[in-house]
Structure formats: structure tokens, C-alpha cells
């Protein structure tokens, strides 16, 4: 998708599907049949059948109770086995959608398409949505068509697609697995919401900072403030310069409250706290992902993003990653497929690259402060030239 949006001037679109009471509509007989088709023996099937059957529920309103009703479908939520059975039930959906770009996490199903022609993208999404709806209906599940969402990237037009019987208009941003995905794919919308949330926490710390000992203030910093930026950093790290500046400002404000120090420069506060900026932490995370790719510890979709250099000059074969040809800043330079090889090839200490285990690697870069970062956030402004690289 990034390649299509970067150099080829293509388009991308996605339909975010919403299932009505997904966990509560699982057909028990069909689930048992699917488990049998996957090779579960009779004893295992009997255990699962016993686990699901003879469940009853009733409703309490104030002091009144309804009559008991038997649960004839659905898997128990809040259990370890419930989500596993749900995933098994949904597993064969991908056989029906074998020629479709689909991502699924529990009951969140997203169809996506990319092409040089906008109409091709829209047509694929509509056709694939129909295929998905047919599978849901055949498996006793119901798609809440009115609550589906549609996103595009690469066009300024306000578009719509038909999902079943519903006409779904394009959204500017939608939440997917905790991330607010926007039309421009820069995640500024997500970070604005996140920064507002973290600012409220910092303000709460400011009100009680003077009555708390240092250790308590630092615990609040680590657990309630800094942790907010630890979710999906590889997704939002390619944000705008202004947004990165805002994140640093929040971090600095929090550190000053913890240390009750309002004069020391931000860089020195970081040293005192033995911590890094969030941008540098994100670079650490990129380095960890590249190590995992190199040592075959990553899932297939991550390994497909990168490729090793063949017999690179001056290095041992396979020690460096090939950089892709990119054409734009927004969709090319600001991407993991471009930045990952840069971090591994040019920024990471050679000693760290020689580590043999992931734990050893994490330990070796714990105190590493990334220097000469080539990303847009770390360039210097030159009058008349704009932002330029400090090095090749």
C-alpha cells in the first residue's frame, strides 16, 4: 500500500466492519463441527460441548428478576477460552476471502484495497464486502452495515461505497484497534487526542506534586504519563515536526514537575532521569524490530517489508538491509520500510549488531542515544533552503 501511495500516485481505501454482538452469535453446533474438521478428537469435542451447553442467564432490574433463559449460542466473554473459540470459528472466513486484502483481530474485520485507479479501489471494496457479508450470513453472524466505516487515502474527494444495502460515506478519521486512523495517514488526529489526554494527567500531577515525595512523583510519571505513548509507536512515530515538538513539551513539563526543577534545560533533565525523548525511544523500538527481522523472530508480514542487501561492500553478507526507492516525504521517507534500514545500517552501534539474542540486544542499546538521525524531525533549518539533512 505504501508503494502504491508513494511513487505511483495511487489510491487506497478500507472498510471497517462492525459485527452485531459477535461473541454472542456463535452457533454451537457449527463451532463443534469446525473443531472436528480441524482434527479435534471426540473427547476434546465433548469437553467443548460441555463447556458451552447448559448455560442459563436472567436479568435483574432493581430488585426484580426475569425468568431464566438458556443460552443457545455464543461463547463466554471474559474467559481465556472464549476468544480462542471465536477465532477458530472465524478462521475459515479467510478461505472465502482468499483473494481479498483483509485484516482481522477478534471481531474487528477490515477490508482494504489499493490501485492506481480510484474506481478499481471502490469496486474491489464493494465486491469484497459482499463476499464477507455472505460468509457472515452463512455462519449465523450479522454485519451491522449502518455502523461500518469507510476510509480513503490519496484523494481529496468525499467518496462513498456501498456495503450490502447501506451507502457508507467516507470518514475523515476512524478508530481501529485503539489507533485513530486519519485520511492523511499521518496520525496527527490520534496524537492530538492522546496529547490532550496526557496533558490532563500532567495537570493532575501538578496539583499534587508538592505533597508527594520524589519517588511517588516518578512512579506517576512512568506509569500514568510516559506509558500513554508506548502504544503502537511504530505507527505514529512519523508524525509532523509540530506534533513531535508538542510531545516533547508535554514530556518536559512532566519532568519539571517530578524533579521540581524549572530552569535546567530539557536535555539535562533527561540525563538526570536517565531517560530518552519519545522520538529516541521510538528509534530504539525500530532497532529492536530490525533485529527481530534479521534473526527471523518477526511475524511474516514484518519480514515481507524488508530485504537484505546481497554482498554489501565492506560488510559481511546479510548484515545490512536494502533501502527502498522512495519518491515522497509523507508516504516514502515517513515509513518503516525506509526508516528501518537507515537505523540498522547507519545509526546502530556495530557492537549491538553482533548480539546473538534479543535480550542481549535490548540490554546493549538501553543507554544508546541515537545520533545523526536522518529523519525529517532531526534535520536542521537553513535560511533560504528549508530543512536539510545534516549528513548523507
PLM regions with names:
Residues 1-2, 50-68, 194-196, 328-339:
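Reverse-transcriptase-like RNA-dependent polymerase core
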